[in-house]
């Protein structure tokens, strides 16, 4: 960098009746340049001064250009004004029946929508923030309040921040209610427009901070931490340094909430707090290393929650959600490497995906298993201490872990982050020995020639054996490869070796069994196993009562049903299995294991999806929606399947608690085709929040009766999603998920429509959706 910005001194003066603001900005510069170009989007620039004198400037739709030579010590003053955004990006308006809130979402390129800046993660600066607001409102930013002046209006000045990136700045204005507790000498504050029912989120935050301080050997850097509940929030949660924002559902969890909600809230809170070190204290130099932030926070969030809630068995969810989602996405030819060369801001939102989060986190788990937990921890701590308050690249982290472990981490990680996809290990009996080879796995049934150095783990009669596989390998014996599914690869056994594996099934962990099941399903979808072979193999697992095994089988059979509801083989297998599980699990018992409560909700929901008769049986229980929150979604979908839209609307208006309300909204997607058009009016009148459109449209497309509705209204759906979720990548994801289902019935039509609606911000989703369509069409014809 030839120059840098040392400090932004920003004052925002809000007109809360018109939802506009005026900004005064003082930028202190260091270094030299022939001109100053600041990112600036949808801002009206009133004046620019350099060292107190007016200067010429030029504005276009992307930047403010100040055509004067600059040098160290120069100060630029900018006056500007803008509207508070009505999207969910930048500095925007968030409304709820409890009130109105101004909030911010700046990752990845939203800061430029709020004030002129160099909106680049490597350009760290100190921020001095002052907010001018109405007297009956409160203000929150990254740092504690320095002073408040009140006359006609309230002027709130905050302490200066440490050096940090623009995307981590936070500004919040609202009539907040608070709860707080101290952790050591720091205050942890929960802020919400709604009444606060529990300090459960604060307790999770305190436990998370305690874990990270011990794990990293570095204290939390700021004097306070806000956990801020945002009524309308596209991103889900955001790690603004010292002022973390969440969707309301994450901070509404109480000790009495359903098992799923409590666990999801804990993992979400722990994820964002991990970023306070990994992302905020040390930040990637550019968005090509976004995965480093997100994958690490993802992996650490599960590790953290597991440290204080062993009963949840959260690494079962890690394997199912993070590793499983990444394996599925990364087996498409329209995948991308973990490390992506990002040039255009429109591309950034599309890499917030299963690869950046799930694959990256799974690779970190694989490396931790390879080098050992303690050397991995030491490497992380070394990396954070060396780059605190600065920027770093992936290679900096690998060097630190390699130094601590003495193992070739750099060489291994170079291959895994720069090559798209992953291997399948082929296991074949070769005389008295077993031969292991690798090839790249694709879900379309083809194979690639790319190879990886694989940290291989083998379960043998004598225990676990580890090695680095870089060529074909011969081994003398094995019970199973990929112990605890620690490696990011699949394993294809020939019949002889598969029989060996099955004969030892009772010796394996639930993570091992999940890996076998998940691989079997991938081999079915890709044509490597026939339907009959798949059915015969899955029979080995049907009597297993482990929660993860049951969840995986239920998910697979329900997915096959949704691909071809008319297949009697699939319908009968799915219905019989799910009915047996519902009967086995029975009703909720006092003091039962949270894993059982969560599992019951999953199998009930899957059976409601598959079996209309069960939906009719369960529908009357909709009246007791809040009695067992884990069953709320199943009961709501049952009501939707039995023409209960009006009752769903009443419930959506009745429940202010997002734990129930969001499930009711999502279930509306399973209403009959003639009722689905009501969804648009519910979005218009605010019954369905903008942030919750994603849920309802996702359910519409899994509903066999809703696919034609989605297709007929795809232009409107895309328009609504793009406006609300600008810069988040959610439109790309909804198209990726919907195109395959729609195309099973409207193959040529969806291909033509996809070509008409293409846009740089969601082309990736279209391409993945079309590729997945071709894959499941082949499967459809075999079912």
Swiss-Prot record:
Active-site residues annotated for this sequence: 272
Protein name according to UniProt: Tricorn protease-interacting factor F2
GO function terms (MF aspect): metalloaminopeptidase activity; peptide binding; zinc ion binding
Species of origin: Thermoplasma volcanium (strain ATCC 51530 / DSM 4299 / JCM 9571 / NBRC 15438 / GSS1)
Binding site for substrate: 107, 236-240
Record's keyword annotation contains Glycosyltransferase: no
Cofactor(s) the protein needs: Zn(2+)
Cofactor note: Binds 1 zinc ion per subunit.
Cellular localization per UniProt: Cytoplasm
PANTHER family according to UniProt: PROTEASE M1 ZINC METALLOPROTEASE, PUROMYCIN-SENSITIVE AMINOPEPTIDASE-RELATED
């Amino acid at each position: 960098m030839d120059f840098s910005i040392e400090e932004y001194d920003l004052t925002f003066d809000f007109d809360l009746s018109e939802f506009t603001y005026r900004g005064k900005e003082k930028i202190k510069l260091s270094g030299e340049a022939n001109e100053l170009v600041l990112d600036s989007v949808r801002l009206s620039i009133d004046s620019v001064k350099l060292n107190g004198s007016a200067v010429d400037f030029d504005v276009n739709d992307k930047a403010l250009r100040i055509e004067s030579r600059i040098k160290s010590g120069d100060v630029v003053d900018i006056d500007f004004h803008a509207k508070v955004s009505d999207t969910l990006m930048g500095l925007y308006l968030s409304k709820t029946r409890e009130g109105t809130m101004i909030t911010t979402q700046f990752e990845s390129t939203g800061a430029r929508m709020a004030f002129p800046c160099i909106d680049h993660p490597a350009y760290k600066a100190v921020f001095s923030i002052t907010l001018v607001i109405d007297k009956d409102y409160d203000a929150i930013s990254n740092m504690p309040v320095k002073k408040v002046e009140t006359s006609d209006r309230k002027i709130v000045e905050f302490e200066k921040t440490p050096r940090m990136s623009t995307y981590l700045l936070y500004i919040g204005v609202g009539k907040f209610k608070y709860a707080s507790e101290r952790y050591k000498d720091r205050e942890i504050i929960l802020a919400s427009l709604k009444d606060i029912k529990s300090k459960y989120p604060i307790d999770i935050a305190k436990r998370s901070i305690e874990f990270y301080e011990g794990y990293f050997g570095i204290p939390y850097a700021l004097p306070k931490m806000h956990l801020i509940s945002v009524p309308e929030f596209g991103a889900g949660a955001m790690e603004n340094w010292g002022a973390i924002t969440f969707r309301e559902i994450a901070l509404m969890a109480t000790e009495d909430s359903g098992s799923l909600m409590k666990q999801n809230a804990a993992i979400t809170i722990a994820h964002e707090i991990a970023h306070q070190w990994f992302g905020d204290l040390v930040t990637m130099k550019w968005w090509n290393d976004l995965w480093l932030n997100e994958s690490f926070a993802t992996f650490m969030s599960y590790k953290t929650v597991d440290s204080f809630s062993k009963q949840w068995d959260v690494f079962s969810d890690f394997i199912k959600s993070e590793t499983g989602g990444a394996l599925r996405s990364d087996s498409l030819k329209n995948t991308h490497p973990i490390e992506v060369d990002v040039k255009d801001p429109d591309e950034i939102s599309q890499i917030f995906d299963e690869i950046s989060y799930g694959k990256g986190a799974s690779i970190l788990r694989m490396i931790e298993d390879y080098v050992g937990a303690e050397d991995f921890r030491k490497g992380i701590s070394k990396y954070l201490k060396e780059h605190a308050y600065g920027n770093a690249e992936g290679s900096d982290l690998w060097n630190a872990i390699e130094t601590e472990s003495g193992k070739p981490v750099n060489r291994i990680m170079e291959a895994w982050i720069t090559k798209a996809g992953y291997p399948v290990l082929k296991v074949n009996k070769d005389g008295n020995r077993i031969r292991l080879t690798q090839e790249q796995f694709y879900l379309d049934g083809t194979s690639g020639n790319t190879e990886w150095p694989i940290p291989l783990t083998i379960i043998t009669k004598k225990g676990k054996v580890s090695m680095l596989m870089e060529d074909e390998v011969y081994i003398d014996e094995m019970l199973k490869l990929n112990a605890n599914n620690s490696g990011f690869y699949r394993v294809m056994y020939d019949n002889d070796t598969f029989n060996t594996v099955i004969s030892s099934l009772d010796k394996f962990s639930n993570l091992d069994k999940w890996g076998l099941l998940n691989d079997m399903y991938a081999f079915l979808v890709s044509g490597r196993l026939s339907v009959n072979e798949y059915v015969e193999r899955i029979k080995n697992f049907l009597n297993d009562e482990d929660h993860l095994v049951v969840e995986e089988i239920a998910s697979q059979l329900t997915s096959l049903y949704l691909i071809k509801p008319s297949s009697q083989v699939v319908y009968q297998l799915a219905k019989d299995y799910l009915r047996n599980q519902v009967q086995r699990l029975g009703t909720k018992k006092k003091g039962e294991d949270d894993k059982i409560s969560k599992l019951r909700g999953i199998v009930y929901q899957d059976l409601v999806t598959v079996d209309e008769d069960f939906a009719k049986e369960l529908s009357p229980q909709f009246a007791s929606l809040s009695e067992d929150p884990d069953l709320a979604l199943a009961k709501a979908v049952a009501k939707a399947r039995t023409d209960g839209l009006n009752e769903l609307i009443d419930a959506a208006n009745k429940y202010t608690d997002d734990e129930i309300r969001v499930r009711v909204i999502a279930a509306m997607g399973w209403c009959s085709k003639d009722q689905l058009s009501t969804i648009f009016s519910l979005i218009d009148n605010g019954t369905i929040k903008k942030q919750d459109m994603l849920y309802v449209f996702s359910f519409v497309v899994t509903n066999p009766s809703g696919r034609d509705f989605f297709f007929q209204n795809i232009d409107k759906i895309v328009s609504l999603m793009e406006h609300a979720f600008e810069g988040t990548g959610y439109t790309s994801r909804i198209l990726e998920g919907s195109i395959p289902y729609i195309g099973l019935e409207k193959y040529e039509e969806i291909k033509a429509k996809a070509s008409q609606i293409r846009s740089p911000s969601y082309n990736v989703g279209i391409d993945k959706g079309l590729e997945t369509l071709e894959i499941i069409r082949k499967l459809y014809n075999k079912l």
